[in-house]
C-alpha cells in the first residue's frame, strides 16, 4: 500500500493554475464590454498582494476531516487561511523594438503552500498546516528583432504554462479546483522558457526545466521539456487557446521512465456577458503499469453586472490505474512523496481505478472597496463529486460527496 501511495504522491506534483496555460498567469476570462486600447505597461517596481481565507462544509461529516480529491480546500468543516501573498514585480514595458528586462518575486504563507513547494526551496521549512513558500522568483528578458514582436525569455522559478486554473485565487471562478488542476498538471518549474511571438495570432513556447515541482534539488537529476503553442485573436477576437506540454522523467530516483503531461485550453466569448472555457487534459507515466489519467472540464460564466457573476463548471476525469487522485492526511505527505519517501499516515489514501465526475455552481461577488485595497471577491459554491467504481469519498465509505464552500480574497 505504501508503495502505491508513494507513487500517487509523486504524481501529485503534477497538480494545477496553475497553474494557467499561458506564459504569465491571466484571469479566467469574464465576459465584459470590449475595452479601449490598452494603456502602456507600468514602469518601475510594483508591489501588491492578497489574503485568502475560506471553508468547505462536507454534508457527510467525514471522521478523518478530509475532502477526498481536494487540495487547497482539503480540510472538511474547518476554516483555512489559504494564502497571504506579497509580490514585487517589474513587468516588461510593452515596447517590442527595445531590449527590456523585468522580474517577479512572490512569497506566500498559508495552508496552500503545503501543496506547491518545489524540491530544495523551503520544502522542509515547517510541518504545520500554515507554511511559507516562494511561489515565483524569475528574471524576464525581452529580446527584439527575431520577429516583429520579438521574444521573451523567463529564467528562474515560475508557475506552469498548463491548465485553465491558477494558484493565484484572483484569476479563478471557484474556490475549489478541478481534478485536472490538482492531479493532471504541474504547479511550478525551475529553468528557462522562451516565448517567441511568431505572429499576432501565434506564440511559440519552449524550454528546459528541472521537472515537476523541482527547484534547487531534483528527485531524479534529469531535465524535462516544457513548452507549447498559444493562439490569440481568432474568430474576430472571440477565441483564444493554448496547447502546453511537459515531457521528461519525474518519478523519484528514476531518470529513464518518462512522464507526459498535455493540456489544451480554449476560451470563447459567446457575448459581452457570456463565455465558455474548455480544458482538456492527458497525463501518462511510463513507470510500472504505465498509469494514465485524462479528462475534460467545461466552464460557463455569465456576468450579471460589474460586481456579480454566475458560473457553472462540469468535469469528468478518469484515473485509469488509480495512480493519481488521492487525499493527504499529513502536512508533509506531498513533499515526502515527491522525495520518494514512504507514507505512513492512514488518512493518506488513493481512490483506485475509477472515473470522477464533478459539477460545481457558484457566484462571484466583487463589492467596491476603499483604497489602499484594490479588490474584494467573495465566492460561495455548491459542489457534487462522484466516483464511478470505487468508494473514494468520506472515509473511503461512499461513492459521492456534497460540499458547500466559500472563500474571500482581499487584494491590496
State each model region's role:
Residues 59-78, 113-230, 240-247, 327, ...:
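Surface-exposed coil loops of outer-membrane beta-barrel proteins
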Residues 70-73, 113-116, 123-127, 166, ...:
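Outer-membrane beta-barrel pore domains
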Residues 96-97, 183-189, 214-222, 251-258, ...:
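Solvent-exposed loop/turn segments connecting transmembrane beta-strands
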Amino acid at each position: 500500500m505504501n508503495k502505491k501511495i508513494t507513487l500517487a504522491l509523486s504524481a501529485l506534483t503534477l497538480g494545477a493554475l496553475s497553474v494557467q496555460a499561458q506564459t504569465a498567469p491571466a484571469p479566467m476570462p469574464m465576459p465584459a464590454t470590449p475595452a479601449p486600447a490598452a494603456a502602456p505597461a507600468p514602469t518601475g517596481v510594483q508591489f501588491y498582494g492578497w489574503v485568502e481565507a475560506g471553508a468547505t462544509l462536507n454534508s457527510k461529516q467525514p471522521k478523518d476531516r478530509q475532502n477526498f480529491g481536494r487540495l487547497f480546500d482539503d480540510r472538511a468543516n474547518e476554516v483555512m487561511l489559504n494564502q497571504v501573498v506579497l509580490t514585487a514585480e517589474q513587468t516588461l514595458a510593452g515596447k517590442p523594438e527595445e531590449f527590456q528586462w523585468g522580474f517577479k518575486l512572490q512569497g506566500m504563507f498559508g495552508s496552500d503552500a503545503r501543496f506547491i513547494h518545489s524540491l530544495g526551496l523551503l520544502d522542509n521549512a515547517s510541518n504545520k498546516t500554515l507554511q511559507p513558500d516562494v511561489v515565483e522568483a524569475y528574471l524576464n528578458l525581452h529580446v527584439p528583432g527575431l520577429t516583429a514582436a520579438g521574444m521573451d525569455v523567463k529564467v528562474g522559478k515560475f508557475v506552469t504554462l498548463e491548465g485553465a486554473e491558477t494558484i493565484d485565487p484572483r484569476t479563478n471562478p471557484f474556490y475549489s479546483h478541478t481534478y485536472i488542476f490538482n492531479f493532471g498538471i504541474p504547479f511550478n518549474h525551475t529553468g528557462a522558457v522562451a516565448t517567441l511571438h511568431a505572429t499576432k495570432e501565434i506564440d511559440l513556447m519552449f524550454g528546459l526545466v528541472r521537472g515537476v515541482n523541482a527547484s534547487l534539488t531534483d528527485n531524479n537529476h534529469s531535465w524535462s521539456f516544457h513548452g507549447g503553442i498559444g493562439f490569440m485573436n481568432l474568430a474576430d477576437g472571440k477565441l483564444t487557446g493554448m496547447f502546453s506540454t511537459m515531457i521528461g522523467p519525474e518519478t523519484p530516483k528514476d531518470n529513464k521512465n518518462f512522464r507526459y503531461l498535455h493540456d489544451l485550453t480554449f476560451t470563447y466569448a459567446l457575448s459581452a456577458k457570456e463565455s465558455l472555457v474548455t480544458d482538456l487534459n492527458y497525463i501518462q507515466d511510463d513507470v510500472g503499469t504505465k498509469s494514465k489519467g485524462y479528462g475534460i472540464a467545461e466552464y460557463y460564466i455569465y456576468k450579471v453586472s460589474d460586481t456579480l457573476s454566475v458560473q457553472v463548471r462540469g468535469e469528468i476525469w478518469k484515473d485509469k490505474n488509480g495512480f493519481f487522485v488521492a487525499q493527504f492526511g499529513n502536512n508533509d505527505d506531498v513533499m515526502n512523496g515527491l522525495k520518494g519517501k514512504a507514507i505512513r499516515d492512514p488518512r493518506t489514501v488513493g481512490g483506485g481505478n475509477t472515473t470522477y465526475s464533478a459539477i460545481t455552481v457558484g457566484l462571484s461577488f466583487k463589492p467596491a472597496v476603499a483604497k489602499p485595497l484594490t479588490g474584494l471577491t467573495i465566492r460561495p459554491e455548491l459542489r457534487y463529486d462522484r466516483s464511478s467504481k470505487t468508494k473514494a469519498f468520506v472515509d473511503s465509505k461512499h461513492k459521492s460527496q456534497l460540499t458547500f464552500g466559500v472563500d474571500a480574497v482581499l487584494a491590496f
